[in-house]
Amino acid sequence: MATTDFYPWEDEYSGQAGVLPELCEKQAIQGFARTFQLAVYLLLTVLGTVGNGLVLLTHIRYRQAHSVTDVCLLHLALSDLLLLLTLSFADLLQIWPPGAASCKALQGIYTLNFYGGFLFLTCISVDRYAAVVRVPAAWRLHPGARRQGWLVAGLAWLLAALLALPQFIYGQAQQHQDLHLCRVVFPRVVSRAARGAHNLVQVVLGFAVPFLVMASCYAAVARTLLAARSAQPRRTLRVLLALVLVFVALQLPHSLMVLLNAAELLASWEMSCAQSRLKDLALVVTGGLADLRCCLNPVLYAFLGQRFRRELWLLFSGAGCVGSLEPRCSGCPSPRRRTSLSSCLDVE
């Protein structure tokens, strides 16, 4: 959740004593950020609430968690939904100025679900790898898979909460003229190197580690499906490729900007005012792009699954929105359990 401010481009004074740093005027960037984030956050909140809400409803109403993936999909939808709701609250800051406690909560909850989403995506890819590539090991774990899934989800939430501690502690409500800000402001005793390291951790755990795990696991799954000469490997492989490419396309630009910010802090170099404006602008735009994943996750990880589409139809049928689902209708999923390797991915 990128924010901009009217501030000296250096966090601390430099040069001779008594000489004030040059101020970098960023009102134009602030105006763009306010308009851009208001429109984008509103759109993402509406779309993401519908998609993730349907995933949660179908899981609660029809699905018993039988694997780590089932449990993590449920928690991924919950995490994405909570993250999007914090974006909608961020839009209200201009109308309802936040207090200190609400600002800390807003920053902390956003970061908690930011990391939580990536951790659940990572766990899903590892579980799919185990289910397809390590089938005997996965089968031995099957009787306790649900309990194991909740344990994995609990550990993921705990790790995400630890990573969000700086936001819960240092979130501050500020006001500049008519602009209300909710920002993370580290005390001056915290060195620039420590703040740079904090940004570096965000890049490593928010992009590098999930990407490497996803790419490795899905590459192994793809090799196994091709070697097994599955009846319909192409569609499954296209879905696996889409999972990785969408993740990279949405997360890489913002991760590069955060990495640039970390390098600036760690190397203690000074940006010109023009460069600082461009950096803030890029952080705002790429941040909105990164948050788009919360709307696409339900499509990529649930809506493409045949079982989920059947459960979604049952949900709408129970609400009287559509007719009942005939088990043998053309194009309808068979209620019989599938046994192919690709069925472990639920994307047939």
Language model region names:
Residues 41-45, 58, 82-95, 107, ...:
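Helix-to-loop junction signature of class
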Residues 30-38, 42, 68-126, 130-142:
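Extracellular TM2-ECL1-early TM3 structural module of rhodopsin-like
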Residues 58-65, 93, 124-140, 169-177, ...:
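Juxtamembrane transmembrane-helix termini
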Residues 17-27, 96-111, 134, 144-152, ...:
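Loop architecture of class A 7-transmembrane GPCRs
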Residues 1-28, 140, 269-273, 306-348:
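Intrinsically disordered regulatory tails of 7TM GPCRs
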Residues 37-40, 44, 149-156, 243:
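Hydrophobic alpha-helical transmembrane segments of polytopic
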Residues 152-153, 182-193, 199-207, 219-256, ...:
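Intracellular effector-coupling site of seven-transmembrane GPCRs
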Residues 49-60, 77, 84-88, 112-136, ...:
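Cytoplasm-facing ends of alpha-helical transmembrane segments in multi-pass membrane proteins
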